[in-house]
Amino acid sequence: MLLYKEKMKLLIKTSLSQWICLNFAKIPIFKMLGFITALFITACSSISKEPVKTVDIYIKPYYSAENGKAENVFVHKEIDPMLRENTIKGYKSAVKFVEENPARISPMTMFTLAARAYDFGLRDEAVTWFYRGQNRLITALYVLDLPKQTVQDNTGFSHVVGQFVNAYAFCNFDKQSLAAENAMKWTVAHPYEVVFLPALPAKFADRQKALKEAEEKLVQRLQEQARFFANPKNKEKWQKERSENFVNERFCW
């Protein structure tokens, strides 16, 4: 696990703009986030059969953790101290705050909750928060005209945490499909209010309409995933890749 973390630090040690390994360097943002199965465990990660019990990562300046313990958390001033406690109680308090105040919770904050949930053995909760965060990020990137660095920081965070959480999620196709659908419904029911802030430039004059279009894309990505796995050749190739990278041994325990 330490080796994995050291490799991740080499990818992102100076800034999240440098996280992308060669496998993803030329993939457009929306294609990379196009549908859930895009986040494979590939050569970016160390190949090992050892079960991955914790999300030990270093994402400067937002988050770092080692041996399942958060070292630095700088994603939301209200819940950062709760997550730094490294206790279930602190994590639950953070979750309670987010659930009661979802309107302006950033995708990064949700990715951090996902990482913390995984560390505490709450891996189904980790999937929930990761997919909610990913969906919220997709809608924000569709509506807002954000600086390149901001886009890279957010998509980088998504990819790093997703290598752990998404690998586990696909251990059970039925559970994954249900979790993805529930996350999509949650995202639609809890629109990200930040996309309506006048201070942030938008790609569209009608932000409300653009948000609805983005939500439709969330539905489409689930349909794309279903079509992908409905093709036996695609599924066989996908399973072969997981097998070659020992994903089931590492995450399906």
Swiss-Prot record:
Supply the name of the protein. Uncharacterized protein HI_1310
**From what organism does this protein derive?**
Haemophilus influenzae (strain ATCC 51907 / DSM 11121 / KW20 / Rd)
